[in-house]
């Protein structure tokens, strides 16, 4: 990197700027690696939502995959209620997934001094 001279003839950069840029690039690589590892771990983190007093229970992973749905036998005959509870349960589990993803991402960004990245 070429040093730039100011009006007084003093150097305005060079060594310090290069070090800062190299440190920033290294930190960016580390952050990207940690985020990639976190994304891969989301398939192992489960979130659960239960609605209708436990009549419908949905288990999903943080990579947004539904893993299991349990439905109370009493709902077998009441399609409209079942449908409403499934919608409510899916919405709740998705909200929980997003919250958990944000919490996990926050742990990483705080390590790098980057608050509120997600």
From Swiss-Prot:
Gene3D superfamilies listed in its UniProt record: Nucleoid-associated protein YbaB-like domain
Source organism superkingdom: Bacteria
Pfam families assigned to the protein according to its UniProt record, in alphabetical order: YbaB_DNA_bd
Chief site of localization: cytoplasm
Signal peptide region: none
GO terms for MF: DNA binding
GO cellular component: bacterial nucleoid; cytosol
Keyword DNA-binding: yes
Assembly mode: Homodimer.
Role of this protein: Binds to DNA and alters its conformation. May be involved in regulation of gene expression, nucleoid organization and DNA protection.
Protein family: Belongs to the YbaB/EbfC family.
Protein name: Nucleoid-associated protein TM_0687
């Amino acid at each position: 990197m070429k040093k730039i001279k100011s009006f007084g003839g003093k150097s305005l950069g060079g060594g310090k700027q290069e070090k800062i840029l190299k440190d920033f690039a290294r930190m960016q690589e580390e952050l990207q690696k940690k985020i990639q590892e976190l994304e891969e771990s989301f398939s192992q983190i489960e979130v659960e939502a239960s609605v209708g007093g436990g009549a419908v229970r949905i288990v999903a992973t943080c990579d947004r995959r539904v893993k299991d749905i349990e439905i109370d036998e009493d709902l077998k005959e009441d399609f409209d209620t079942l449908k409403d509870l499934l919608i409510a349960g899916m919405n709740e589990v998705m909200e929980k997934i997003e919250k958990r993803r944000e919490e996990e991402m926050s742990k990483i960004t705080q390590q790098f001094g980057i608050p509120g990245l997600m």
